[in-house]
Amino acid sequence: MKVRPSVKKMCEKCKIIKRKGVVRVICVNPKHKQRQG
């Protein structure tokens, strides 16, 4: 899980979703998991 000020899709399979007001990226590749913080 990477915590960054701006989250971006790193590949085609990344999805940007919002959970409880937190922007997250979920992906089949665990290295691409991100959270805005």
Curated annotation (Swiss-Prot):
Question: What keywords were assigned to this record?
Answer: Ribonucleoprotein, Ribosomal protein
Q: Which SUPFAM superfamilies match?
A: Ribosomal protein L36 (SSF57840)
Record's GO cellular component terms: cytoplasm; ribonucleoprotein complex; ribosome
Q: What is a GO molecular function of this protein?
A: structural constituent of ribosome
Identify the PANTHER family for this entry: 50S RIBOSOMAL PROTEIN L36, CHLOROPLASTIC (PTHR42888), LARGE RIBOSOMAL SUBUNIT PROTEIN BL36C (PTHR42888:SF1)
Q: What is this protein called?
A: Large ribosomal subunit protein bL36
Q: Which Pfam families match?
A: Ribosomal_L36
Name its GO BP terms in alphabetical order.
Answer: translation
Give the protein family: Belongs to the bacterial ribosomal protein bL36 family.
Which InterPro entries does the protein's record reference? Ribosomal_bL36, Ribosomal_bL36_sp
